[in-house]
Amino acid sequence: MRQIPVDTSAASVMVAQPPQPKVRDRRTGEIATDAETGATMMTVDVMFAANGEVEILSVAVPEPGISGELVMGTPVAITGLVARPWENEFNGQRRHGISFRAVAVTSLAAGTAKAA
């Protein structure tokens, strides 16, 4: 699958919605897991500001990659962010978009990061 690395070095990023489990199947409520590690996947909505534009991105992150208290407005660093184009067909309708995944989302707020 194609992956496009996203450079976050010139961006300001902060939490828009705290982490929550990523749902794999809405019909059954099944929670998504990382294919390699089996870790629960989490979704963190972030405000991504760069080049005078602001976007809200939903970023999938393995649960161990979430560090620090991530509440609304918390500035964060995103490690290993990639964009993945996707397309599917459901009930005869074609849909497409871009999904985002990261290795880690780390709080930059003083005193909130967990000790390693």
Give the residues covered by each predicted segment.
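OB-fold and OB-like single-stranded nucleic-acid-recognition modules
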Residues: 1-116
